Amino acid sequence: MRDAETQGLVLYSRNYKEKDKLVKIFTESFGKRMFFVKNFGKSPYASSLQAFTDGKLTATINDGGFSFIEDVSEVVVYKNISSDIFINAHASYIISLADAAISDNQYDPGLYGFLKRSLELLDQGFDMEVVTNIFELQVLHRFGISLNFSECAFCHKTVGPFDFSYKFSGCLCPQHFDEDLRRSHLDPNVIYLVNLFQEISLDELKKISIKADMKLKIRQFIDGLYDEYVGIHLKSKKFLDGMSGWADIMK
């Protein structure tokens, strides 16, 4: 065990025994850790340890079991994520993806910062689907997946249009479409936007407008990539998918 200070982003909590809780926090300095909080309801830090909060932790870090919180300060609460069910669903999904992408205790300040910035953009009102798509695509390499959407897999031509081939795990230009008769037959704009999303920095992201039908095409393509190459099935993703028809009902 060692005492330390670190920034931490609360991923989730769950009940443990009668009055205690386990709180999973993605720390900047020590990766994802499970913290034991005794008598959670009476803890002075209870409000600071809700999901979608970020703060400075003073803690005892234990590599072989539960860690323990000594103090929480400089707390940031993502209020819009907490209050809007649609934003909340997207945030819950990307948090689940981050949790699945690396092992517990694995030091990864890059992913911590990427997740934090993604949540900030969601909370600020940036397009939920766009932020989520960017996160999904850029976290793929944490699962060991590296896909190139910027050039043809055969001739390396960098000017589209392109289609995607699961057979070759890459793009095809029109001159090489015949190499895979079962290619995806995508709208060329899907590959263009997916390549943009894979390369863009969140700090450079501006307000952009994408039509609903194009968002659906991108969604279906990314789902296909995850089914083919990653193979995880998250409850938060299933819930998010089930919300597709809610918007009109709740108007």
UniProtKB/Swiss-Prot annotation:
Pfam families: RecO_C, RecO_N. GO terms for biological process: DNA recombination; double-strand break repair. It comes from the Bacteria. SUPFAM superfamilies: ArfGap/RecO-like zinc finger (SSF57863), Nucleic acid-binding proteins (SSF50249). HAMAP family: RecO (MF_00201). Belongs to the RecO family. This is DNA repair protein RecO. It comes from Lactococcus lactis subsp. lactis (strain IL1403) (Streptococcus lactis). The gene is recO.
